[in-house]
C-alpha cells in the first residue's frame, strides 16, 4: 500500500466517463421496449459473463499487483428482495452495452420469462441504484484510502522535517563550536602578535639608540685619532726644532771655543817682562775687564738670549698648537 500513490486525474476522468456511458446504456435499454423473455435471458447471461469477467480481471490484477498495492473489497450492501448483481469496475461498465446490443435467442426452458415488463423495469431501476451505490461506496473507499495515504505522507513528511531540523540544529551547534574555537585561536594569535610587535618596537628603539651611540663613538674616535695625529706631528716638529736648536747652540759653542783658544794661543806667544806686564796690566785693566771673560760673558749672554728667544719661539709654537688642539676639540664637541 505504501508504493501505490492513488488514482491520477486521468484515471478519475476515465472512471467518470465510464459511469456516464453505463448510465446512458441502461437508459437506452430501458427505453427500447425489449421483450421480457429476451431481456430476462440476456440479464442472466450478462450476470454470468460479468461474473466470469470480474473473476478473470481480479485474478489478473492480483497477479500483476503487489500484495501491498491490492485493494480490499468494499462492504457488501444489505440484502434486498431480488438478488443484486456483483459490483462492477469502471472497465466492466462499458461491457454491458456491447452484450445488450447483441441479439439473444429466447430460452423456453428459462423460468424468468414469466416476469412482467413492469417488474423488470423496477428491477433495472434497483440495479442502477445498486450500481450507483456501489460506485459511490467505491469512490468513498478510494477517498478514504487516499486520505489515509495523505495522512501517512504528512506524517512521514513531518517526521523527515523534524529529522532534518534536528540535523540542522546539530550542524548549527557544531558550526558555533567551530566558530568559538576559531575565535579563541584568533584571539591567542592576535595577543601573540601584539606582544611580538611591542618587542619589535622596543628592539628597534634600542637598535636606533645603539646606532646613534656607535655613530657618536665613531665620530669621537675619528676626532681623537685626528687630534692624536696632529699632536704627534706637533711633537715631532717640536722635537726636531729642539734638536736643531741644540745642534746650532753646540756649533756656536764650538766656534766660540775655537776663537777663544786661538786668542789664548796668541797671548801665550807674546810673553812680556814683569815691568811690561805690570804696565800692560795697568794699562790693560779695562781691557782685561773687557777681555776674554767679558767676551765669554757676552757669548753666554748671547747664547742665553738666543736660548730664551728659541724657548720663547717654542713656547709660542706650543701655545699655538695647544690652541689649535683646543679648537679641534671644541669643533668635535659641537659635531657631537
From Swiss-Prot:
One of its GO terms (cellular component) is Golgi apparatus. Signal peptide: none annotated. Residues 61-72, 302-322 have a biased composition (Polar residues). Residues 74-88 have a biased composition (Pro residues). Residues 26-118, 268-336 are annotated as: Disordered. Its main location: cytoplasm. The keyword Cytoplasm applies. The keyword Cytoplasm applies. Keywords: Coiled coil, Cytoplasm, Golgi apparatus. One of its GO terms (biological process) is non-motile cilium assembly. Residues 213-271 form a coiled coil. InterPro entries: GORAB. It is found in: Cytoplasm; Golgi apparatus. Disulfide bonds: none annotated. Belongs to the GORAB family. This is RAB6-interacting golgin. The gene is gorab.
Amino acid at each position: 500500500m505504501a508504493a501505490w500513490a492513488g488514482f491520477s486525474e486521468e484515471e478519475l476522468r476515465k472512471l467518470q466517463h465510464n459511469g456516464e456511458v453505463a448510465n446512458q446504456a441502461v437508459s437506452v435499454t430501458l427505453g427500447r421496449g425489449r421483450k421480457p423473455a429476451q431481456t430476462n435471458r440476456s440479464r442472466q447471461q450478462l450476470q454470468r459473463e460479468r461474473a466470469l469477467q470480474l473473476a478473470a480481471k481480479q485474478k489478473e490484477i492480483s497477479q500483476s499487483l503487489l500484495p501491498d498495492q491490492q485493494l480490499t473489497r468494499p462492504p457488501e450492501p444489505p440484502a434486498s428482495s431480488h438478488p443484486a448483481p456483483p459490483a462492477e469496475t469502471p472497465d466492466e461498465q462499458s461491457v454491458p452495452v456491447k452484450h445488450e446490443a447483441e441479439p439473444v435467442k429466447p430460452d423456453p426452458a428459462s423460468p424468468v420469462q414469466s416476469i412482467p415488463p413492469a417488474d423488470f423495469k423496477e428491477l433495472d431501476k434497483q440495479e442502477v441504484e445498486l450500481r450507483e451505490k456501489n460506485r459511490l461506496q467505491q469512490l468513498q473507499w478510494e477517498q478514504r484510502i487516499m486520505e489515509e495515504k495523505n495522512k501517512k505522507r504528512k506524517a512521514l513528511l513531518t517526521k523527515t522535517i523534524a529529522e532534518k531540523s534536528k540535523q540542522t540544529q546539530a550542524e548549527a551547534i557544531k558550526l558555533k563550536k567551530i566558530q568559538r574555537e576559531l575565535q579563541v585561536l584568533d584571539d591567542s594569535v592576535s595577543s601573540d602578535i601584539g606582544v611580538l610587535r611591542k618587542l619589535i618596537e622596543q628592539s628597534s628603539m634600542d637598535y636606533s639608540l645603539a646606532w646613534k651611540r656607535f655613530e657618536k663613538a665613531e665620530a669621537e674616535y675619528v676626532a681623537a685619532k685626528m687630534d692624536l695625529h696632529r699632536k704627534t706631528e706637533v711633537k715631532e716638529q717640536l722635537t726636531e726644532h729642539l734638536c736643531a736648536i741644540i745642534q746650532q747652540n753646540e756649533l756656536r759653542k764650538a766656534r766660540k771655543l775655537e776663537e777663544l783658544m786661538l786668542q789664548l794661543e796668541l797671548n801665550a806667544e807674546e810673553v812680556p817682562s814683569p815691568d811690561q806686564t805690570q804696565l800692560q796690566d795697568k794699562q790693560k785693566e779695562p781691557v782685561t775687564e773687557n777681555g776674554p771673560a767679558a767676551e765669554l760673558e757676552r757669548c753666554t749672554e748671547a747664547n742665553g738670549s738666543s736660548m730664551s728667544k728659541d724657548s720663547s719661539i717654542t713656547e709660542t709654537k706650543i701655545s699655538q698648537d695647544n690652541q689649535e688642539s683646543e679648537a679641534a676639540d671644541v669643533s668635535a664637541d659641537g659635531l657631537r
